[in-house]
């Protein structure tokens, strides 16, 4: 029994390109398939299975909090996902409930396809169920067995793609997005961009921390300067006073040294005078002795007394000096 493929929520932006790639070999326009439509109407359990599978896929592919990659196109995808869900729940169900009019009014199918087309194009997405239903309607009844085989292969292929989607779904999205004109980011490129942003943010944080540390050091140094500047000024004043005292002491030392030189010269002069007076005294004593001897020889007694008195006076003068 023919079954339509399940929905893949994460590939909503690439259904036009996906349908053109997967269904192009066997989507040749032919007569409407009445038998396929009647079998689809007679199987209402397929709809429940489709809804359960779509709900489970939507629950499995939600991005968790721990994911480190956040795509920049997430708001647009979320809006398109809501529109795609509303199309599946309301219009897609109404399309299958109206398939009982295929025998009576074949033109009604074209009208319904025309009505469903703008709704899908409003969100820039086309469901695989709609395109596959159109292909089933266009195939002749003679190709019913081949259609069933193609449906089974298509379901297996879609399910395998759904299983492989968490691992390499982004690469297939990039390949199909380039052909359909939609721009999808590569996860490696996203990681590289995020790493660059994080490194830039860390560098900015380090620069800000370094600047704040420099500002704190500058403020601390300014506070120390403001505290030590009065003490430095006081020490400068004391140094000036000490320099003045030092200069005065130097001048006094110079004066004292000059006085010492004068005193030394005066002492030398006095010593020379003492030597001269001693020599004079010795000469006078010798002359007096000679005179005394001469007088003693002549017999004059008064003159020796005078000579003795003069010699005593000279000795006193020498002792005083």
Curated annotation (Swiss-Prot):
**Coiled-coil segments:** none
Compartment(s) where it occurs, according to its Swiss-Prot or TrEMBL record: Nucleus
The Gene Ontology CC terms held by the record are: nucleus
Provide the primary localization. Answer: nucleus
Q: Does the keyword Lipid metabolism apply?
A: no
Could you say which tissues express the protein in this record?
Expressed in vascular tissues of leaves, stems and siliques, anthers, filaments, tapetum, mature pollen grains, pistil vascular tissues and papillar cells, and funiculi.
**Consequence recorded when altering residue 230 to A:** Homodimerization and binding to G-box element
Q: Where is the composition biased (Low complexity)?
A: 110-133, 145-155, 172-182
Leader sequence residues: none
Any Gene Ontology biological process:
positive regulation of DNA-templated transcription
Does the UniProt entry include the keyword Lipid metabolism?
no
Question: What is the deletion mutant like?
Answer: Pollen morphological defects, reduced pollen germination efficiency and pollen tube growth.
What's in the keyword line of the UniProt record? Activator, DNA-binding, Nucleus, Transcription, Transcription regulation
Q: Which GO terms describe its molecular function?
A: DNA binding; DNA-binding transcription factor activity
What residue spans carry the region label Disordered?
A: 97-189
Known role: Transcriptional activator involved in the sporophytic control of cell wall patterning and gametophytic control of pollen development. May play a role in the control of metabolic pathways regulating cellular transport and lipid metabolism.
Subunit structure comment from the entry: Forms heterodimers with BZIP18, BZIP43 and VIP1/BZIP51.
Q: What is the name of the protein in this document? A: Basic leucine zipper 34
């Amino acid at each position: 029994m023919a079954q339509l493929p399940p929905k893949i929520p994460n590939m909503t932006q690439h259904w036009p390109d996906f349908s053109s790639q997967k269904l192009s070999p066997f989507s040749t326009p032919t007569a409407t398939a009445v038998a396929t439509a009647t079998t689809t109407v007679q199987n209402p359990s397929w709809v429940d299975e489709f809804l359960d599978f779509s709900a489970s896929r939507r629950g499995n592919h939600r991005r968790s909090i721990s994911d480190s990659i956040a795509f920049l196109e997430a708001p647009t995808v979320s809006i398109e996902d809501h529109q795609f869900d509303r199309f599946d729940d309301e219009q897609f169900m109404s399309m299958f409930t109206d398939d009982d009019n295929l025998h009576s009014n074949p033109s009604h199918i074209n009208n319904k396809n025309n009505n469903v087309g703008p709704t899908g194009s409003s969100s820039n997405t086309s469901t695989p169920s709609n395109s596959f239903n159109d292909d089933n309607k266009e195939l002749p009844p003679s190709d019913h067995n081949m259609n069933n085989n193609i449906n089974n292969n298509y379901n297996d292929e879609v399910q395998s793609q759904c299983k492989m989607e968490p691992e390499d779904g982004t690469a297939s999205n990039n390949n199909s997005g380039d052909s359909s004109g939609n721009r999808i980011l590569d996860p490696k490129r996203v990681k590289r961009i995020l790493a660059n942003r994080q490194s830039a943010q860390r560098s900015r944080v380090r620069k800000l921390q370094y600047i704040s540390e420099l500002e704190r050091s500058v403020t601390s140094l300014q506070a120390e300067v403001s505290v030590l500047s009065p003490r430095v000024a006081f020490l400068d004043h004391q140094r000036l006073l000490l320099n003045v005292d030092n200069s005065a002491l130097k001048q006094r030392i110079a004066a004292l040294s000059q006085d010492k030189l004068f005193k030394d010269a005066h002492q030398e002069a006095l010593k020379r005078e003492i030597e001269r007076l001693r020599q004079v005294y010795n000469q006078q004593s010798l002359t007096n002795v000679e005179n005394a001897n001469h007088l003693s020889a002549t017999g004059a007694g008064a003159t020796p007394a005078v000579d003795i008195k003069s010699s005593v006076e000279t000795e006193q003068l020498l002792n005083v000096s």
